[in-house]
A protein has these predicted regions:
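NAD(P)-dependent dehydrogenases' Rossmann-like dinucleotide-binding region
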Residues: 51, 184-202, 214-216, 220-228, ...
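Beta-strand-loop-alpha-helix segment that lines the small-molecule cofactor/substrate pocket
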Residues: 115-116, 120-168, 183
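Rossmann-like dinucleotide-binding domain that binds NAD(P)(H)
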Residues: 216-319
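Basic phosphate/pyrophosphate-binding loop/patch that engages nucleotide-derived ligands
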Residues: 152-158, 174-189, 197, 207-209
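N-terminal Rossmann-like NAD(P) cofactor-binding module of classical short-chain dehydrogenase/reductase
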Residues: 109-111
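N-terminal Rossmann-like dinucleotide-binding module
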Residues: 18-88, 167-169, 269
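N-terminal secretory signal peptides and thylakoid transit peptides that target proteins
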Residues: 2-19
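C-terminal helical cap and adjacent loop that interface with cofactors, partners, or active-site loops
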Residues: 14-23, 27, 34-35, 236, ...
Length: 463
């Protein structure tokens, strides 16, 4: 990873504002909600949106009662214009270069909803420009990018919420974690994450770049390649490409299902392990994976179709004979297995004998809020995750999906991807974040940044 350094000292110093979350009853009846804060202070928050695709627009709609979208940046002109109409009635300023938003003093918070390979660079530069950020998951394309993000966050003190909104689903995922914390499954021995397999594609031919798209800037830090697209047989939908949405299925821009859905379910699994006392990180990861193309030395031998894993089963081993399984088959969800019982949770249900036992032995009313860092709880998952971020922005306190816990779990997803590409088990030094005895695999902890798209670092004011 290439980092460019200069001597500009124009970012805001770290600000620490004392504040504690209000004590609130069980579930959604917060005494101090973000909505009431907004009404009382009469100061809706101006926000800049970087990446105007489906997630970015959807999240802004979810947060519309709290924020005003005043600036939008995207390399796709059509997306800029359509999102501007939907989110601000055409009143927001639109840019092709997100750096112009970073330079605006009237914007204190940002939402980054770009493709995965474009998360790290604007996030770091936003923190250094003094902005608090809600960034979509997965936060990084590599493990080393996560090291840099954590370093900059500590130095700047900026508030960063990661878009793993399952943490804010109180009646399912957060409740499952609260049950684990309350000892309802005993000591965890194994946790299984079923995230579904990845898609295949036919050969996707080189195509003309759409006039509305700046393809070079869309690629950004990634290697320069041709734009590819093939329409669906029925001529409906977006077709298949190496661009919008479909970027998920190319290792050059994402990690496939391992970092797409893995960033959700592995996050909850890791959260459960932490509240269960599993303080030590993983020591190895290995298993099997199938790809739609052949691989040599960790790289796909074909560049004209999807290349991320379609089927997989990985076992992550921890000290104390604890395991995490990441698999493509079975029902999508998380199975938490302890020595006293087991529970299954996904976005539709929470089940298991310990769940049934809640009828006669319910959780304490404060149980869920304890695992939710004592923060206010008020909305459905998507709105609540935004409410949490904006509350933490106002109070300058750590949000529920902070960069440090996120990278703990995302490292697991990245290691699974590296193991898949080489087809072998990896030994992991968690303290130093290095693969042990495998220089070839270790090289995949980072990625080169294309010239002109390096991360702009700014020295801290006290350096």
């Amino acid at each position: 990873m290439k980092v460019k350094t200069n001597n500009r000292r124009d970012f805001l110093k770290k600000t620490v504002v004392a504040g504690t979350a209000a004590s609130v009853p069980y579930f959604f009846s917060s005494q101090k909600t973000l909505a009431s804060e907004t009404r009382a202070k009469n100061d809706r928050i101006p926000i800049g949106l970087i990446g105007a695709g489906g997630m970015g627009v959807g999240n802004m709609v979810a947060a519309k009662e709290y924020v005003d979208v005043v600036a939008i940046a995207d390399v796709d002109k059509d997306r800029c214009e359509s999102s501007n109409k939907k989110l601000s009635g055409g009143k927001a300023d639109i840019y092709s270069d997100y750096q112009e938003i970073l330079e605006r003093d009237d914007i204190k918070i940002l939402h980054i909803a770009t493709p995965d390979h474009w998360h790290t660079k604007p996030l770091i530069e936003a923190m250094l420009a003094g902005k608090d950020v809600y960034c979509e998951k997965p936060l990084t394309l590599t493990i080393d990018e996560g090291k840099l993000i954590r370093k900059v966050q500590k130095e700047t003190g900026r508030i960063v919420q990661v878009g793993t909104q399952q943490r804010s689903t109180f009646n399912l995922f957060a409740k499952a974690v609260a049950m684990v914390a309350d000892g309802r499954v005993g000591k965890i021995k194994r946790v299984q994450c079923a995230i579904g397999g990845g898609p295949r594609s036919p050969e996707i031919p080189v195509a003309d770049v759409p006039e509305n798209l700046d393809w070079d800037r869309w690629l950004g830090p990634a290697p320069k390649v041709d734009y590819r697209h093939i329409p669906n047989a029925n001529k409906k939908g977006r077709g298949k490409s190496n661009c919008h949405y479909e970027f998920r299925w190319w290792y050059e821009y994402s990690g496939g299902k391992l970092t797409d859905w893995g960033a959700h379910h592995v996050d909850i699994a890791n959260w459960a392990l932490k509240v269960n006392g599993q303080t030590e990180g993983p020591i190895s990861i290995g298993g099997r994976a199938e790809h739609p193309v052949e691989y040599e030395n960790g790289y796909a031998v074909q560049n004209d179709r999807y290349n991320t894993a379609t089927k997989f089963n990985f076992v992550v081993k921890y000290p104390g004979a604890v395991e995490m399984v990441i698999r493509d088959d079975t029902d999508n969800g998380i199975l938490i297995e302890g020595d006293k019982g087991r529970i299954f949770v996904n976005r539709r249900r929470l089940a298991g004998k310990p769940v049934e036992d809640l009828a006669d032995n319910p959780l304490d009313k404060s149980a869920i809020q304890k695992v939710y860092k004592g923060l206010p709880m008020e909305h459905n998952a998507r709105k609540q995750h935004w409410a949490n971020f904006l509350h933490c922005h106002r109070e300058q306190i750590e949000p529920i999906s902070d960069v440090h816990s996120h990278m703990e779990m995302l490292n697991i997803c990245h290691l699974a991807g590296i193991s898949a590409r080489f087809g072998r088990e990896l030994k992991w030094d968690n303290a130093n974040e290095q693969i042990v005895g495998d220089d070839q695999a270790n090289a995949f902890l980072a990625r080169p940044y294309r010239e002109g798209y390096e991360i702009e670092m700014r020295q801290t004011a006290n350096s």
